[in-house]
A protein has these predicted regions:
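Active-site-adjacent "subsite" loops/lids of carbohydrate-active enzymes
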Residues: 28-33, 41-45, 110-170, 209
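Substrate-binding cleft of secreted/luminal carbohydrate-active enzymes
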Residues: 270-299, 305-437
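Catalytic domains of carbohydrate-active enzymes, especially glycoside hydrolases
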Residues: 48-75, 170-175, 275-285, 346-352
Length: 438
């Protein structure tokens, strides 16, 4: 998942949940209220973290947890053909995914659990990359490597599909959520076996350049074929399973369908997610609309992308992703409201997903704990208050992340060192069931 770096803290906070007024009451209509839970931070490494995660989701009226269970060719679940993640805490028999499923499915109301898996990114230290990287590893046209596996290598797709089907067979997950389902960029795809296969299928002898249109189309088709074939196998294995994916939305979005082929998703990382949604390869897609609302250009980017997502014929297969880690809390809430509102022609999406549980705002992110200079781009500079040690900053970030769970479902306020008390209004004041995207 692509993250942009932001920074900033508050000197003090006030956790002041207030009473929601009747006018703020939600309709209770089905709506995805999802939360990404990444494995690079705490969230499900220990039994205590899992218990807190479910309690926080209930407090926030979150009804879907998208939990990262395959980070770098590893597993946050015990019954796996890949190695158990090294940072799982507790006894060896503790199974993070199994315990989360038990608590989330037993919650009232029930919380869905979608297993988030990195597809082509494995990391250069993962077992699969160490063992197979020489032949399966993706390479740039200059020979560089970055820990990605190459979609153009048939064995990569076979192995990865096997990992995912094994997960679905062993755990009662509600959905499978694909991330890094793409190339790293336009100059990638040059593993020897992928280039050899392209030459054979295209009937050419020369190695293509990165901008060769046929070579670009071939790489794009490799990614699409993996998604299509995986869906086919998953629906045989478990028809009720929901397949989704984290989708690229770099820069400004298209104004309509005619502009789709000019996007970075389509022509740079070869992720033709518009066709996946139109053809129903995904039950729903989650475009990563990660933009800072306090930057005018990025705010415009966000609004253009969500307009495209609502009015291009596949709104019934879209859950809009918002980047809390790039925003002040009140701005994230504003983005959620805009995402959930009807378009100018009356179209609505299935819901929203928030990135992320560990970084709910620029005050809750750890991207910049050791780098106060990274806060220089923020319009409000809350990097005062005397806390300079890592543990103190982490504790303050944790307090903000906890507060945000309250802000989602209750009126609340917090204290900013420059603006004083800032009041927020909830976006999920009542629980809501998940919709059926099919």
């Amino acid at each position: 998942m692509i993250r942009k770096v932001a920074a900033g803290f508050l000197a003090g906070i006030a956790l002041l949940p207030l009473s929601a007024s009747p006018a703020q009451a939600a309709s209770g209509q089905p709506q995805y209220r999802a939360l990404w839970v990444d494995a690079f931070h705490g969230g499900m490494r220990s039994p205590q973290q899992v218990e807190k995660l479910v309690a926080d989701a209930q407090r926030a009226n979150i009804n879907t947890l998208i939990v990262q269970v395959r980070k770098r060719g590893d597993a946050y679940f015990n019954r796996s053909i890949e190695p158990r993640a090294a940072d799982i805490q507790g006894p060896i028999e503790f199974d993070p995914l199994e315990y989360l499923l038990r608590l989330a499915h037993g919650a009232a109301p029930r919380i869905e659990v979608h297993a988030w898996v990195n597809v082509y990114f494995a990391g250069q230290t993962s077992l699969v990359y160490v063992q197979q990287g020489d032949t399966w590893g993706n390479r740039a046209n200059d020979g560089a490597t970055s820990g990605f596996l190459d979609p153009g290598v048939p064995e990569v797709g076979i192995y990865t599909q096997r990992v995912f089907l094994d997960l679905v067979r062993n755990y009662d997950i509600d959905g499978l959520h694909l991330d890094y389902i793409r190339y790293p960029g336009v100059t990638w795809g040059y593993s020897a076996s992928a280039v050899a296969l392209y030459k054979l299928q295209a009937g050419v002898t020369r190695t293509p350049g990165p901008a060769d249109p046929k070579w670009q189309a071939w790489r794009r088709a490799r990614v699409t074929a993996f998604v299509r074939d995986l869906r086919h196998e998953l629906k045989i294995e478990k028809p009720s399973l929901k397949l989704s994916g984290a989708l690229i939305c770099f820069g400004g979005g298209p104004f309509d369908a005619s502009g789709w082929t000019s996007t970075s998703a389509y022509n740079s990382v070869f992720q033709d997610w518009r066709s996946w949604l139109v053809k129903g390869y995904f039950d729903f897609g989650v475009p990563m609309n990660y933009d800072s609302d306090w930057i005018d250009q990025q705010k415009a980017w966000f609004d253009r992308w969500i307009a495209f997502e609502k009015d291009s014929g596949f709104a019934n297969r879209v859950v809009i992703g918002v980047g809390g880690f790039l925003n002040y809390p009140e701005d994230t809430l504003a983005q959620i409201r805009r995402a959930l509102s009807a378009s100018t022609v009356g179209n609505r999406v299935l819901g929203v997903a928030i990135y992320s549980y560990a970084s709910t705002s620029v005050y809750g992110s750890d991207d910049f704990y050791g780098s106060p200079d990274l806060a220089s781009g923020l319009p409000r500079q809350p990097y005062s208050g005397g806390i300079t040690n890592q543990s103190g900053l982490a504790a303050r970030a944790g307090s903000f992340n906890s507060l945000f769970m309250t802000q989602l479902s209750h009126a609340a306020s917090y204290t900013d060192v420059q603006l004083g008390s800032i009041a927020t209004q909830p976006v999920f004041p009542q629980p809501a069931p998940v919709p059926d995207p099919r």
